[in-house]
């Protein structure tokens, strides 16, 4: 299966002198450009996101970090440090979500941790407080996957009427330090 992100609109001869961004804004009239978005999940220092482009206006992404809650995913070790997959996947998911927002996309962060935010530490400490948009994450793997599926589908039923392009992005990280 191949997924394509919508192409950036290029200025044609008819729009010469206008920037690609201006052309994208014109085609996205029902998605007015926001200048800033506030997302507390990014952490105290990064919660305000400056929207620098409108090229992803009209798109909606469901960003899902792997594991979380009672399931840390793969666990690797570096010296005395344990590396828990869910913490790194969550950090990467937040960074991706923030970048998508800077480009004008609407982003739904499915797995959430109100405390962690985007972290700069080399070794991220583990926690079990992640939720699926406020709901506790089940221990049972099938229930966990079903919970995420149900949440994304419920959001999509509403979002597909408003956005021309909706996609889910799932992030997993293998933190084992030796070959598989």
Residue ranges and their predicted role:
Residues 1-180:
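Catalytic-site microenvironment of enzymes
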